[in-house]
Structures are given as C-alpha cells and as structure tokens.
Amino acid sequence: MQNKVYEQEDKMEKQEQREDKLGTPPVYSLVHFSPKMVGSVATTLPLSSSLSSGMPLGYHLSSPQISGVTISTTGQLTSKATAGSCSRMENSLDAGPFLVPKKQDESPMIGDGEDYFLSLFGDSKKLIAHSKHTQKTLKYFSMILEEVGQFTASSLGDIEIAEVNVKGLFVKLINSSLDKEMAIGDHILQQNVNGQTISLYRFLPNIVMQASSTVTVWAAASEAKHQPPSDFLWKEQDKFRTSPDCITILCKPNGQAIAWYTPIHWKQAWEKLDTDIEFNRCSVVSPTFRKHVFQWTASTTTITKEKQDQPKEDISNYQVEQAQVFLKREKEIPPTVFPNRSPWCQNPYVSAHPYCPLIEPRNTSTAGGNLDRQSRSQPTRPNRASEKFTKSLNASKKMSYLWQ
C-alpha cells in the first residue's frame, strides 16, 4: 500500500513539473456559500451536477430567482488543495440538495412623482394642515381689517369725522342725526402729532350741516372747487397727513374736541393679529403650567382646530377638572377665664394688689421653702397681746357669772 501511495505522489509531482514546463499557470477556484436569506421562500438547487459537469471558473449565479451563492477565483492554490477541496465539495453536495434562498422582489424605488415629493417635504396631511393654518391666519387678518376697519373714529355728538383720505386729499365730516341740523361755524379742524398741532383749518361762520349730510374739506393737491356749504377748499394745505401717529380732531370754537379720527396702519393690524395669536396660545396651556398657576389637575378651556385632529384619548387629557380650594384656617387661642373669687381668699403670701397679674406662675416648691423659713424665724416667746386678751375675756366671763 505504501508503494502505491508513493507512486501516486510521484505521478502528481511529474504532472506538476510538466505543467510548469508548459508555462500554463493553473487557475483554481474557491467556492463560497453565503446563504443570506432575502425572502421567506427558498428554492432547491442540486449544485453537485452543475459543478461536476464543468462549470467555468469565476461563474456567478445571477439568476433573478437565486441569490446568496458566489463562485470566485482568489489567487493560486496547489493541486493537492484543489483536489481535496473539490472532492469534499462534491461529497457535501451529493449528500443532499442545497437550499438557495429565493430573492425577494424589490420594492418600487422612490424617486418619481408624489412619493418623491413627500419624501422631500413630508406627509401630505402635514402640508394640508400647514396650508390650512396659513389660510386661517390670512382669513383672520382680513376679519380684523373688516371689524376694526382702516381707522378708529369717535365723537361726542352727532357730527363725526367719516373719512380721512389715504392719499391726504380730503377730510369728510358727516351729520349722523336724521332730523337735526348742526352748526359748525367757526369750528376748527386740526391734525395733531404727539400732542402738537401741525395743521389747523377754521370753518367760515354761520355754516350749518343739514340732517344726514356731509361736508368735505379738500386739500390744495386735490384741485377741487370751493363750493360751500358742502365743499371747502383749503388752499394753504397741500395734503392732509395720514400717518398712524396723526390724529384728526374737530373742535368747537372754544377748543373742546367733539370728534376725532385715527387711521390704522397695516403694521398695527399685524400687531393685533400677533397679540390675538399669542392670546390663543396662552389659552391652550400645558397641564403642568395650569396646575402650577391655577392648581388644576388638567388644563385647557379652549381647543383649537389643530388640536381637534388629535385622537380622543389626547383630547380627554385636556378636560377641565377644577380642584378643591382649601383655605388655611389659623387656630384660635381661647381667652383665659379668671376665677370669680375675692383676692382676699387667696394665699396670704400671694400679692393681692388689683394691678398685680393673677395668672403669674408660682413655684410651689419655693413657696413652701419660704413658709418653712418664716416659721423658723418666728420667736419662741409668747405674744403678750394675746395673753392680755385672754385675761380680759376670762374676767368678763366671771363678772357675768356673778351677776347671774
């Protein structure tokens, strides 16, 4: 047996020498199996027949239904290693069919149309919500302009300043009374900025406004005609001032203001819009903030339309539940009641002066000690006054007995 083995080895060495002489470098291959699962379904492929039937080296299984198996050439190996690896591979493949995972169908690529747009700019629902919020803001701004208007005007009587032209061409007065005539003779139409008068126009005397009539004061730039008592041309004034800081006032001859007009600039309208939006934000407060300020367990009194899009579970957290308010009551100390007794019935060693405090604490131990000291300090000799009193008492008794 050993001779046969040596003979086979010699043959192999001779074959290697012949191949080296011919100069044809042998090319060997490594087979790598990487069973990477892409789909849930796998197909069986008997690779033993395909590999043993002379599969070309460097062949790559690129079938659309098969993936995970690659055969590549990496470097040069000896014939012994190649033969051993091939034989082992054939034995392992003949043992049973090889499971090759089927390639999963690729998902459609995002890059065209609406999907690509949404991938860049977000969900369409969010875009719709944002556009709705913008439309709501603009609509609210227009409502502010409609409600407030482009000016604020006030009056104390029936005469009002109806309009100050935006271009500063005229100022229009109106008599809002339906049946009264109003005299505006010698009245003053003036414009003030920061409390200082910048222009002043005095009406002609004996000017009367009929009921529901208008009077217009034109500036020189309007090139209007002077037609009293309805139209007056102010030649000295090129244009009226229309800035937001300018107030147009109609005064009586004595200087009392009876009507005034203030234009509203678009910036002021935006400021009002900002304040209203900020107020709406404050009205929808987080639960922790309301709990801190008002000591409520949950918060919000108003829910905007944006909040209504949330599920009902989130909205239920914003229900108002007012907690009980507890008032801290201080404990009252009851007044001390003094005993209804005469101070002369007390201990003779306690002061009986009416201004002396009777509730002053007294230590009994010290009082007892004082009594003992006083008893010790008393003299042992008898009291003469008491002896005389007893003698006189006995004598009186004897005299009464004798008289009987």
Curated annotation (Swiss-Prot):
It holds the Pfam family LTD. Gene3D superfamilies: Lamin Tail domain (2.60.40.1260). SUPFAM superfamilies: Lamin A/C globular tail domain. Residues 1-22 have a biased composition (Basic and acidic residues). The keyword Iron does not apply. Keywords: Intermediate filament. Residues 147-265 form the LTD domain. Residues 391-404 have a biased composition (Polar residues). Residues 1-23, 361-404 are annotated as: Disordered. GO terms for cellular component: cytoplasm; intermediate filament; nuclear envelope. Belongs to the intermediate filament family. This is Lamin tail domain-containing protein 1. It comes from Macaca fascicularis (Crab-eating macaque).
